[in-house]
Amino acid sequence: AGTVGKVIKCKAAVAWEAGKPLCIEEIEVAPPKAHEVRIKIIATAVCHSDSYTLSGSDSEGLFPVILGHEGAGIVESVGEGVTCVKAGDRVIPLYIPQCGDCNFCLNPKTNLCQKIRVTQGQGLMPDKTSRFTCKGQLLYHYMGTSTFSEYTVVADISVAKIDEAAPLDKVCLLGCGISTGYGAAVNTAKVEPGSTCAVFGLGGVGLAGIMGCKAAGATRIIGVDLNKDKFTKAKEFGATEYINPKDYDKPIQEVLVGLTDGGVDYSFECIGNVKTMRAALEACHKGWGTSVIVGVAPAGHEIATRPFQLVTGRTWKGTAFGGWKSVESVPKLVKEYMAKKLKVDEFVTHTLPFNQINESFELMHAGKSIRCVLSF
């Protein structure tokens, strides 16, 4: 109310340069322009993509920037022409928007809305400017969301209005990781009942992939990870077996082919490593196996396999945000969670105050957390 149309001064975690810890700074957040929404972020989680960009490996990474793309909050104000949300609405910012009228949105085969893709990749709002400043300097936006700030501004096509009873410190995770892994199984792979699946990488996305395989009726779900401590959690989400590549002296794809009478029906690479991407494809069954790439590999890395792997009937696919058309799907995923059909709370291993954000990056790198939720 008192802030509408005014610049808001608030706390944010600023990444001034690659490879350095984030700094908690006071920043200025300009009011939303036409077709923009200013959101008070209530909770945000830290995802591997944030740390990937912070590390400097991201070809689209720009600095200084406000990172963060797994958040939830309350609309503070809207710019002119905004009809999808109003002040007071509970929302999840979306790093893949849904404008509803580009040729991607009109095609049922994809969720990759292109309406604001170019400016989003440049770290700017659709009008090619930023809403963030700090110490007189422009700060870039990140993935169209920038949730590591008490207030953020997003395009009106990059916001999903959700059930107002939903706990924001939990459903923020549906803004990326859980939706991504779960959708990779149910939308992209379209896992069938009775199938055998292998999930490489048992972080948040991999666990969500396991949950998706189970929901789709898979009977064998094999978790693959170098960290044996991850298996207990994987079992809770539905994994039936666990294998550790360190325990074998032959390639893990050969181990999987041996364990599954010729290979798995579906495999999921939830790490972002081109070598495991190859292993995941080659672990698939001849004639019908499908491997889905979910993890994002560092810029410039390339995948390799022998073409014969594909000639003999394997399929290699990729997915972004689990194939969900965001504006229409995220509210439904929140409803599924509210109806206890989707695990979300179980992904939260740590909760910290926002000013301890660097600690949450450390927990993630040490493999100690699945998701750490920060609250303001």
From Swiss-Prot:
Its main location: cytoplasm. Binds 2 Zn(2+) ions per subunit. One of its GO terms (cellular component) is cytosol. Its cofactor is Zn(2+). It catalyses: a primary alcohol + NAD(+) = an aldehyde + NADH + H(+); a secondary alcohol + NAD(+) = a ketone + NADH + H(+); S-(hydroxymethyl)glutathione + NADP(+) = S-formylglutathione + NADPH + H(+); S-(hydroxymethyl)glutathione + NAD(+) = S-formylglutathione + NADH + H(+). The keyword NAD applies. It is an enzyme of class 1 (oxidoreductase). GO terms for biological process: formaldehyde catabolic process. Homodimer. Class-III ADH is remarkably ineffective in oxidizing ethanol, but it readily catalyzes the oxidation of long-chain primary alcohols and the oxidation of S-(hydroxymethyl) glutathione. Also acts as a S-nitroso-glutathione reductase by catalyzing the NADH-dependent reduction of S-nitrosoglutathione, thereby regulating protein S-nitrosylation. Belongs to the zinc-containing alcohol dehydrogenase family. Class-III subfamily. This is Alcohol dehydrogenase class-3.
